[in-house]
């Protein structure tokens, strides 16, 4: 008979949030394992190691992790300087992974393929909560099954496809050799692929901004380099940030992009909902309905992220049907409702799944399809959860978080989603009709309830489900990049998974 309380806590993913979770577990003296699919820590962060983060070091460090590192002689970086993704790994994540209380618990090339309850499928409810978790893992020596008293899924998110309907556009899979998802290093390791090429960037978030500016720089150095940009919205009004942003690097990024647009360094295509790609003798042609964009050689897909829920299919999760975040968290982060202020601090109580106690999705993945995740938010999540697992409910319920006053949206404007000046006259009729349609909020039918119809002064969002709150404008296209990421595969600004 397995005694569940003697089993380790399993953390899935050795990115920033997974490693900080390990630090808290170590500090609390709880046994744990960290299972990482890649050959090293922070596999996803390494994909954007060239990118400078929007947040200075003092936003990017966790106090408990810092305490563990300091005890080993670690010296903190300048708190006001801005690290690149590579520096974030080298100065913080790698030393943390080498800590003697953490290193023995790391398992690399251990890809988790399924999580469930030992001896119980999804339909089996008898004594479910009393059973340990069974974690199926593909290892270098074959498939294994590990048992755990609790599981923290910090495995991050996966890129959205180009297709405007939520699935890959027709022809997208056939063109994958010419598509990069996230934020390629066009001035460094990926330069040869983009030099002298015609490139289309799809998406309107900060990762798209960074790639566009790098391509503009490349075009100054490499003749024949042409930069195209496709966005869903018909207007960029209010989309390029504010110099009043408490994260000034984020505000400056949008201002630099505005200058590049004014100088005609970028060919902007508005109102593009990608539905088809076709490879021709002139290049790849992207279609939005009957509209065809000019042929290009390469495409950068910066259309946001979503959680990979496949490995969780045998768990009884209470997820919002739209945002795909825990039901107690979803209303606070849903871009259809969330204005551009800060997300309320949250921890174990908001992240608990009532029918699967001691299972938690944390980090970027916990936000589902919402784009406003910050590293600090993830650190607070795992601090609260680990305190609860240790039985310290006073600490678990205590709020220990400060976010930028300008919020995760990055602008000085803080008002209800979709103010009148955010929507063109042409969009108004469609938008108003959409706004009064009720939306189903909660995952399971036993907890189903309808969200009240959105009553917003002025025209509402121009798309049936706006998918982000960013840059002082909550009403944004789904084809946008997260404000920041560390665990996801895009440009890492201040967040992680």
Where are the regions a protein language model picked out?
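N-terminal Rossmann-like FAD-binding beta1-loop-alpha1 element of flavoenzymes
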Residues: 7-34, 201, 208-218
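Glycine-rich active-site loop/strand segments that organize a redox cofactor
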Residues: 40-91, 182-188, 227-248, 357
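Feature captures the FAD/FMN-dependent oxidoreductase FAD-binding
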Residues: 75-150, 155-159, 268, 275-286, ...
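A Rossmann-like FAD-binding core segment of flavoenzymes
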Residues: 114, 216-320, 387, 393-405
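Active-site substrate-recognition segment that forms the wall
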Residues: 198-238, 252, 346-370, 374-389
């Amino acid at each position: 008979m397995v005694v569940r309380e003697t089993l380790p806590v399993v953390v899935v993913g050795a990115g920033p949030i997974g490693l900080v979770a390990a630090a808290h577990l170590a500090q609390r003296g709880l046994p744990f394992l960290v299972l990482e699919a890649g050959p090293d820590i922070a596999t996803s962060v390494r994909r954007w190691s060239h990118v400078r983060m929007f947040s200075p070091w003092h936003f990017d460090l966790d106090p408990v992790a810092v305490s563990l590192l300091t005890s080993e002689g670690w010296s903190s970086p300048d708190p006001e300087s801005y690290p690149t993704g590579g520096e974030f790994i080298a100065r913080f994540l790698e030393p943390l992974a080498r800590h003697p209380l953490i290193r023995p618990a790391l398992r690399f090339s251990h890809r988790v393929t399924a999580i469930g309850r030992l001896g119980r499928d999804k339909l089996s409810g008898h004594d479910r909560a009393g059973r340990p978790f069974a974690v199926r893992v593909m290892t270098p020596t074959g498939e294994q099954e590990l048992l755990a008293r609790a599981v923290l899924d910090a495995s991050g998110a996966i890129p959205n496809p180009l297709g405007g309907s939520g699935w890959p556009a027709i022809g997208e899979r056939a063109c994958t050799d010419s598509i990069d998802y996230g934020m390629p290093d066009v001035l460094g390791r990926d330069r040869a692929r983009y030099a002298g090429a015609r490139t289309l960037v799809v998406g309107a978030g900060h990762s798209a901004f960074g790639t566009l500016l790098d391509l503009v720089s490349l075009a100054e150095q490499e003749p024949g380099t042409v930069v195209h940009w496709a966005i869903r919205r018909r207007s960029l009004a209010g989309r390029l940030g504010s110099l009043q942003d408490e994260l000034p690097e984020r505000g400056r990024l949008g201002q630099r992009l505005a200058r590049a647009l004014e100088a005609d360094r970028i060919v902007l295509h508005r109102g593009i909902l990608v539905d088809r790609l076709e490879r021709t003798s002139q290049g790849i042609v992207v279609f939005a309905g009957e509209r065809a964009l000019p042929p290009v050689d390469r495409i950068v897909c910066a259309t946001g992220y979503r959680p990979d829920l496949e490995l969780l299919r045998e768990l009884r999760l209470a997820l919002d049907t739209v945002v795909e975040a825990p039901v107690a968290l979803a209303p606070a982060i849903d871009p259809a409702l969330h204005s551009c202020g800060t997300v309320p601090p949250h921890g174990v109580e908001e992240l608990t799944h009532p029918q699967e106690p001691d299972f938690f999705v944390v980090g970027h993945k916990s936000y589902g399809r919402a784009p406003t995740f910050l590293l600090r938010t993830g650190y607070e999540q795992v601090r609260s959860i680990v305190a609860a697992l240790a039985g310290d409910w006073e600490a678990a319920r205590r709020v220990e978080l400060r976010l930028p006053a300008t919020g995760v949206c990055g602008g000085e404007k803080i008002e209800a989603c979709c103010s009148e000046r955010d929507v063109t006259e042409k969009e108004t009729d469609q938008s108003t009709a959409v706004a009064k349609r009720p939306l189903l909020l909660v995952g399971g039918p036993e907890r189903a309830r309808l969200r009240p119809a959105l009553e917003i002064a002025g025209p509402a969002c121009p798309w049936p489900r706006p998918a982000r709150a960013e840059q002082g404008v909550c009403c944004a296209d789904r084809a946008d990049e997260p404000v920041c990421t560390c665990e996801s595969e895009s440009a890492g600004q201040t967040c992680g998974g």
